[in-house]
Amino acid sequence: MREFNVSALLEGYRITDEVMAVSVQHAIKVMKSKYRNARNVYVFN
């Protein structure tokens, strides 16, 4: 497990959250499951 900085557009605001995940794709899925209405999700590192 690695820690990723994931950014998402949530209700018009850009938020950044640290997520523990196995891969970049998994980090995006975790972020989308955490915030159901998240859009434009991407990973910094």
What are the residue ranges of the model-derived segments?
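Short aromatic-glycine-(Arg/Gly/Cys) micro-motifs in beta-strand/loop hairpins
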Residues: 1-15
